[in-house]
Amino acid sequence: MKRVFYNVGELATATGSAAAAGRAQGTLLTLHNAWLLEENGVIAAHGEGTPPQADDSVDCRGKLVTAGLVDCHTHLVFGGWREHELAMKLAGKTYLEILAAGGGILSTVRETRNASEDALYEKTRGLYLEMLAHGTTALEIKSGYGLELATERKQLRVVRRLKEEFGDVAATFLGAHAFPEGTDHEAYVELLCSEMIPAIAEDGLADFCDAFCDDGVFSAEQSERVLLAGKRFGMIPKLHADEIREIGGTQVSARVGAISCDHLSETGAEGIKALRDGGVIAVMLPATSFYLKKPYGDFRGMIDAGVPVAVATDMNPGSTPNLSLPFAMTAGCLYGRLTPEEILTAATLNGAAAIGMAEKLGTLEAGKQADLVVWDADNLDQLIYRYGTNRAAAVFKKGVRVTGKE
């Protein structure tokens, strides 16, 4: 069946099937008084002026249309919440003080271990639907709140169930998220490499393997061992790095051939060069910097140096309980100094590339899956400018409306 989306005030899209870098990241195809033709869930054509005939039609009412957003870094499967930590943060308590009071990541680990798979699935499904309503049509979800095999498997089974129901969900094994309480650090790294990664791979539960390479967590050497072990078992490397301090994570990501390196709040010139030379996508997480009142990172410098940049929510219960990728886009423009055109590419094409889905998602081009959003905005600048409310008027996946305000 053919469906035409017509009366599009502005159609804005990145182009291509690989991450855009440098000047290309800020170069969009922009059409006015436009239409888009979808056939059997796939984009067939687009243009300006009089739309073609079709079996069905959608009046976009002169509004902005973009590709569906791709959130390439989330921690969506978790037990409990941590709102009780807010007062401690406002009182100036450090992370270590919050941890000592029974909070922090290890409190989420306890809650996640205690939750049933079905309870986690229902909670995660609800969060996914909220993200979908804000324009996110594909995403990545990490484990990392188990820190032992049974719970890591449980988290990744939840991700698999979500993928089976909705499609376009990438799974990342993040057993190297933190060290379990009372565990010898070297022994845990060995456990990850020799037992947990092989078991996760045998179950076919993860597309990617990630580690938190930073001060006080996993060293550069430990992170590299974990990522290489994952790579041997078919998991594509990703990395959390330079959120707290530079300890060589960007260089690790380049050496192991990581698809992305994320956070990067403290990355300097040498790290930027390593990312560029290694062909690694830099993922900015500005909503995390906003919530933690931490540096946003030199993503302007990264784009100018030719590093492809993606943007994601980092949705998690501790450092950014935010489901809205459009909010992260606005923060990325205001504090990461990206242009609206660059941030749209970051949230669509480059986000898709960071989870290996750019061949089918991330742009409104013929042959791509018809995932698109009609925004309650007249143009791209207005979408970024009018932050603070959900401006996704209608969300379509494979050409079918899945959510919207009307």
Where are the regions a protein language model picked out?
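Active-site-adjacent C-terminal substructures of enzyme catalytic domains
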Residues: 236, 246-363, 375-381, 387-389, ...
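N-terminal metal-binding scaffold of metallo-dependent hydrolase/deaminase domains
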Residues: 1-51, 380-382
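Short peripheral tails and domain-boundary helices/loops at the edges of structured domains
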Residues: 392-406
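Metal-associated gating/positioning segment near the N- to mid-region
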Residues: 60-123
